[in-house]
């Protein structure tokens, strides 16, 4: 038997073929899934306890012997071995190992068990393609806002994998874009910033449940919506000029290039848009241009320009303050860009020492207008020159203001003097009027009061006036060339040639006598005037 142990094998295979052909229609008892390059174990039924002789076959067009527990039968390949004297162990699976395997067990009776081995492969080499606007130097993809982005994912797998896309925005959970067994391509139209994040392609082998995934970051860029803004200012803590350029509202931050105009000399380039210039680089009227560029912005970019100018000062050259009072000195700066820093100094008592706010000095500034208010003026402390200085990196300007401190005026004395002068003038005018008036008339009394008073009206021709008139007549006769003028002036005087003194008195309100007396006086005056005319007619 030992010598001819291998002789009966052909007859056994023929019998097994006939038996298996009738058994296949019964159905399979187990399905085992393995993966390429992995190992798998196929069990012979579900029986526990004492087992008989086991032989494994593979069902192709005809049964193929693989392995038997009979030590006299060698395995078909070294990859095949028995585990626990019943199970078939296959090493390093390949896609060709997939198929139906049959186990024959001979104990008291012969039993047959079938196992279906399925071999899965992959997914391997997932390839993700995202067609976007561009790629950064580090490999990160970016898309311009409002553009179209195409996504595709490919993987080698058996059976073909199920492809699923996942999206995760910043600081949020993942969400699925759906899965498909056949289509692994989709597009996003008019992409927006809220779709910026990580896109993951997941390929799943439904047979082996093995999956692979590839995550790709996609950034959504957009330029600022408005024009850039630039300005100049004094740097804090130093006497330098700071140029600042801003172009806000875009992502990512743009690039800034400062150049000097005209000439195009590059001042500096940075992501911050800030450049520092020393005084040696500055001059009145010089222009600086900021040129901005964005990765998805217009190719020509955008720009803005600043022009620096030195300050000019305007102030009152002289101010006056009364002792104990208050005075305000003003200083106005115009034309300065960037705005100048305004300082107040003394050039007499405290040369080049900046005046600081105190209880006596109040400094206020509104824009480019500054005021210095001095309280409780003192001639010893406050009188003198004050300097208003405008400091700017472009230039320094100074203006001197003279403050004069005086004693307050005596208002009462001034008013008294004016009143005295008015009274003196009135007295002089009254004296002149009294001196040159020929006739005076005083009316005394008031008949309406009904008082019992004696009212007297008196007309008096003094001896002195008569003598003066006679002298004037004699002088007129001497000067023949002045005769005519003297004759014109003579009627204005009332001569008293008859030297008659008339007195009319009204006593106890006798109105009738007063009227008669007044009439007699008028008659006498008329006679005197007629006598004067007759004398004028006589030859001299």
UniProtKB/Swiss-Prot annotation:
Acidic residues: which segments have biased composition? Answer: 461-477, 521-534
Signal peptide range in chain numbering: 1-30
Gene3D superfamilies linked = Immunoglobulins
Annotated Basic and acidic residues bias: 482-500
Q: Which InterPro entries match?
A: Ig-like_dom, Ig-like_dom_sf, Ig-like_fold, Ig_sub, Ig_sub2, Ig_V-set, Neural/epithelial_adhesion
Q: Which domain of life is it from?
A: Eukaryota
Q: Where in the cell is it found?
A: Membrane
The UniProt annotation puts the region (Disordered) at 461-500, 513-540
Disulfide bonds, paired cysteine numbers: 44-103, 153-201, 245-290, 331-388
Sequence ranges assigned to domain Ig-like C2-type in this UniProt record:
31-119, 123-215, 223-309, 311-404
Q: What is this protein called?
A: V-set and immunoglobulin domain-containing protein 10
């Amino acid at each position: 038997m030992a010598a001819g142990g291998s002789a009966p094998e052909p007859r056994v295979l023929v019998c097994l073929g006939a038996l298996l052909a009738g058994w296949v229609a019964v159905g399979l008892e187990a399905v085992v899934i393995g993966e390429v390059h992995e190992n798998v174990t196929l069990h012979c039924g579900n029986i526990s306890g004492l087992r008989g002789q086991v032989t494994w076959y593979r069902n192709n067009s005809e049964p193929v012997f693989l392995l038997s527990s009979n030590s006299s039968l060698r395995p078909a390949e070294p990859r095949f071995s028995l585990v626990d004297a019943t199970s078939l162990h296959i090493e390093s699976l390949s896609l060709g190992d997939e198929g139906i395997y049959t186990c024959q067990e001979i104990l008291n009776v012969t039993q047959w068990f079938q196992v279906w081995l399925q071999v899965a492969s992959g997914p391997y080499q997932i390839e993700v393609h995202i067609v976007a606007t561009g790629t950064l130097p580090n490999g990160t993809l970016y898309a311009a806002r409002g553009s179209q982005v195409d996504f595709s994912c490919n993987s080698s797998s058996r059976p073909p994998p199920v492809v699923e896309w996942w999206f995760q925005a910043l600081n949020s959970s993942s969400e699925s874009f759906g899965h498909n067994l056949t289509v692994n391509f989709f597009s996003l139209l008019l992409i927006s910033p809220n779709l910026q994040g990580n896109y993951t392609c997941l390929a799943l082998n439904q047979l082996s449940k093995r999956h692979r995934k590839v995550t790709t970051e996609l950034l959504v860029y957009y330029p600022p919506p408005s024009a850039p803004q630039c300005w100049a200012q004094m740097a804090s803590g130093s006497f330098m000029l700071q140029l600042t350029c801003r172009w806000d509202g875009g992502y990512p931050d743009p690039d800034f290039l400062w150049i000097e105009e005209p000439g195009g000399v590059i001042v500096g380039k940075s992501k911050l848009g800030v450049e520092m210039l020393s005084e040696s680089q500055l001059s009145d009227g010089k222009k600086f241009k900021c040129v901005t560029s964005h990765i998805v912005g217009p190719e020509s970019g955008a720009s803005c320009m600043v022009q620096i100018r030195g300050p000019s000062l305007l102030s009152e050259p002289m101010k006056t303050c009364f002792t104990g009072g208050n005075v305000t000195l003003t200083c106005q700066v115009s034309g300065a860009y960037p705005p100048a820093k305004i300082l107040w100094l003394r050039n007499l008592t405290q040369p080049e020492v900046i005046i600081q706010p105190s209880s006596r000095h109040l400094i206020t500034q509104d824009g480019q207008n500054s005021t210095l208010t001095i309280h409780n003026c003192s001639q010893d402390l406050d009188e003198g020159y004050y300097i208003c200085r405008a400091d700017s990196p472009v230039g320094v300007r100074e203006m001197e203001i003279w403050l004069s401190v005086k004693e307050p005026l005596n208002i009462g004395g001034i008013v008294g003097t004016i009143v005295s002068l008015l009274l003196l003038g009135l007295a002089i005018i009254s004296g002149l009027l009294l001196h040159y008036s020929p006739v005076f008339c005083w009316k005394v009394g008031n008949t309406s009061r009904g008082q019992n008073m004696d009212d007297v009206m008196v007309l008096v021709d003094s001896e002195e006036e008569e003598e003066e008139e006679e002298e004037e007549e004699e002088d007129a006769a001497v000067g023949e060339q002045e005769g005519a003028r003297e004759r014109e002036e003579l009627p204005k005087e009332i001569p008293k040639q008859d030297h008659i003194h008339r007195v009319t008195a009204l006593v106890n309100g006798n109105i009738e006598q007063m009227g008669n007396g007044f009439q007699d006086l008028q008659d006498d005056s008329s006679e005197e005037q007629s006598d004067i005319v007759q004398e004028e007619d006589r030859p001299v």
